[in-house]
Amino acid sequence: MAAPAVKVARGWSGLALGVRRAVLQLPGLTQVRWSRYSPEFKDPLIDKEYYRKPVEELTEEEKYVRELKKTQLIKAAPAGKTSSVFEDPVISKFTNMMMIGGNKVLARSLMIQTLEAVKRKQFEKYHAASAEEQATIERNPYTIFHQALKNCEPMIGLVPILKGGRFYQVPVPLPDRRRRFLAMKWMITECRDKKHQRTLMPEKLSHKLLEAFHNQGPVIKRKHDLHKMAEANRALAHYRWW
């Protein structure tokens, strides 16, 4: 086990001091597992308003931070990030999960068509309703999308824990990222079901989103089924701490 480490150390010691410093500063050669950048690199700030703000309006602290960034190491901005007003990290995550075979152009097009279909359906419902009912109809597709996913998020999940040679499904509270992931996964899985093969993806997804927005549909039922299973296994909840 020690031989490879000694070999690497000798290889590093054979390099000149200037070469070693240059290699250590290269992000692609930094010895950090699964990371392109070393811990010294800071996350990029993708905000046009921050850079458009004149220097005269900055506070002393903001001036110091801006001057400090001139000498700091900054990570490259991700290719999918943008400073557009339409940028939504949740929709971007949903688009990436919906993507198949790396065809992000198609996934993004389907997402745009889905939001357009949601808006068309809500406006049709709005114009067909009475004056009193129009005030209760939500027409913003972004608000409907976020609320639909929020309604699909489970609060408690099941985790297999080995105890006495057997695996038990133990109920545990889920973190926010896991809740959001399950809601998106269930929504996409239901839309890819083979029951309605002739229905296009934007039409199916918009229908599922509107159902989830009103706390209805198979995705909401799937969340309730998971909660019922967690309630049935609540006697095993103490296995979390063992």
From Swiss-Prot:
Q: Which residues form a coiled coil?
A: none
SUPFAM superfamilies in the record, alphabetically? Ribosomal protein S7 (SSF47973)
Keyword Transit peptide carried by entry? yes
Transit peptide region: 1-37
Looking at the record's lineage, which domain of life comes first?
Answer: Eukaryota
| Main subcellular location | mitochondrion
Q: Name one GO biological process term.
A: mitochondrial translation
Q: Which Pfam families match?
A: Ribosomal_S7 (PF00177)
InterPro entries associated with the record? Ribosomal_uS7, Ribosomal_uS7_dom, Ribosomal_uS7_dom_sf
Residues spanning the membrane: none
Positions where N6-acetyllysine occurs in the chain:
208, 228
Q: Where in the cell is it found?
A: Mitochondrion
Q: Which UniProt keywords apply?
A: Acetylation, Disease variant, Mitochondrion, Primary mitochondrial disease, Ribonucleoprotein, Ribosomal protein, Transit peptide
Q: Which GO terms describe its cellular component?
A: mitochondrial inner membrane; mitochondrial small ribosomal subunit; mitochondrion; ribosome
GO MF term set: mRNA binding; RNA binding; rRNA binding; structural constituent of ribosome
Q: Member of which family? A: Belongs to the universal ribosomal protein uS7 family.
Subunit field text? Component of the mitochondrial small ribosomal subunit (mt-SSU), essential for mitochondrial protein synthesis. Mature mammalian 55S mitochondrial ribosomes consist of a small (28S) and a large (39S) subunit. The 28S small subunit contains a 12S ribosomal RNA (12S mt-rRNA) and 30 different proteins. The 39S large subunit contains a 16S rRNA (16S mt-rRNA), a copy of mitochondrial valine transfer RNA (mt-tRNA(Val)), which plays an integral structural role, and 52 different proteins.
User: Related disease?
Assistant: Combined oxidative phosphorylation deficiency 34: An autosomal recessive disorder caused by mitochondrial dysfunction and combined respiratory chain deficiencies of complexes I, III and IV. Clinical manifestations are variable and include congenital sensorineural deafness, lactic acidemia, and progressive hepatic and renal failure.
Q: What's the protein called, per UniProt?
A: Small ribosomal subunit protein uS7m
The UniProt gene name for this protein comes to MRPS7
